[in-house]
Every structure is written in C-alpha cells, then in structure tokens.
C-alpha cells in the first residue's frame, strides 16, 4: 500500500477544512461550488484547488515575467467590451495581455484505479487536457483541464497595439469560449456521480 492510500483520509480532512475556510472568506468561484461538493462527497476523492475558468487582463513587466505581473481585471463570467476598455485604461507599463483560461481542478484520488476512472470521465466530458498531475509516494493528483485558452498581447508600455473593433471581436470570442467551459463543468457535475462512492 502506498503512503497516499494510508494518509488519504487525513489529507482529505485537512483539504476540506481548507476549502471550508476559503468558502467562508469568499475565495471560491461561486459557479463551481456545487461541483466541488459533489466531488468531495465521493469516498475516494477530494479537491485541493480549483478555478471555474476566467477572462483576465494582465500587465507584465517583461515577456514571461508572471512573478511580477499585475492583474488589472479578472472575471469568472462573461465580460462586456466596456469593462475591458475601462480595465485597459489602467495599463501604465510593461506588456498588456488579454487572456482566457479554461477551468482547472486538482483532485486527489485514493488509488491509481480511482485516478484513471476520474481522468476518463473528465476527458469524456470535454476536458481533453486532463492528466494525472502527480504520482508520488505521498499523493496522487488528477488535473482536470480543458483546451480553451487565449493569450493575446494588446500593447506595451502604455501603447495599445489594437483598435476597439478588434477588441470587440476578441471579447466576443472569449465569452464564447468561457460559455463552452461552463457547459463542460455542468456536464462533469451531472456525470460525476458515476464514480463509485
């Protein structure tokens, strides 16, 4: 028996305490709470982190410098062009990026069989970039991710490289992608009870 199987119940207890703390502080995306509760109700699984998918605008000092980047705007819902334009006006230096990231969930599984079962279910629900993120003596983690993603440079050092009509088009595409990811989350929530308890 692997250590992660022996320590699973203790790890789950700690993870659920952390989740409850995050819920009380309003740090969990509201549209994913129901799915998290369903996963955590399963005997052989628990969630360790999650994001329900987002549209964001980031200011980055240098290309690839995410460590020192600043979120100018972040939404876990569809956005209006006016919100994006207002947020872009906050840009005062470095590179300006418009991004869409798909939902991501990290789920600990009790056994490798449980992990594979969850991975197959997630992929069948459209989360094609899902994988077994970590297999070690201490933990076994499935990462549930989809393919939807946009990373678009908009400008640099206060200069905008694109016009408003282009922004209208990318906001429309971003909202469509986010809508698709939310549909996948709902499908996963509907299907998750197929996993053994």
UniProtKB/Swiss-Prot annotation:
Residue stretches in coiled coil: none
Keywords recorded for this protein, A-Z: Methyltransferase, S-adenosyl-L-methionine, Transferase, tRNA processing
E.C. code: 2.1.1.282
Enzyme class: transferase
Covalent S-S links between cysteines: none
A GO term for molecular function: tRNA methyltransferase activity
GO process annotations (BP): tRNA methylation; wybutosine biosynthetic process
Reactions listed under catalytic activity: 4-demethyl-7-[(3S)-3-amino-3-carboxypropyl]wyosine(37) in tRNA(Phe) + S-adenosyl-L-methionine = 7-[(3S)-3-amino-3-carboxypropyl]wyosine(37) in tRNA(Phe) + S-adenosyl-L-homocysteine + H(+)
Pfam family, one: TYW3
Stated family: Belongs to the TYW3 family.
Function per UniProt: S-adenosyl-L-methionine-dependent methyltransferase that acts as a component of the wyosine derivatives biosynthesis pathway.
PANTHER family per record: TRNA WYBUTOSINE-SYNTHESIZING PROTEIN 3
Protein name: tRNA(Phe) 7-((3-amino-3-carboxypropyl)-4-demethylwyosine(37)-N(4))-methyltransferase
Annotated organism of origin: Thermococcus sibiricus (strain DSM 12597 / MM 739)
Gene name of the encoded protein: taw3
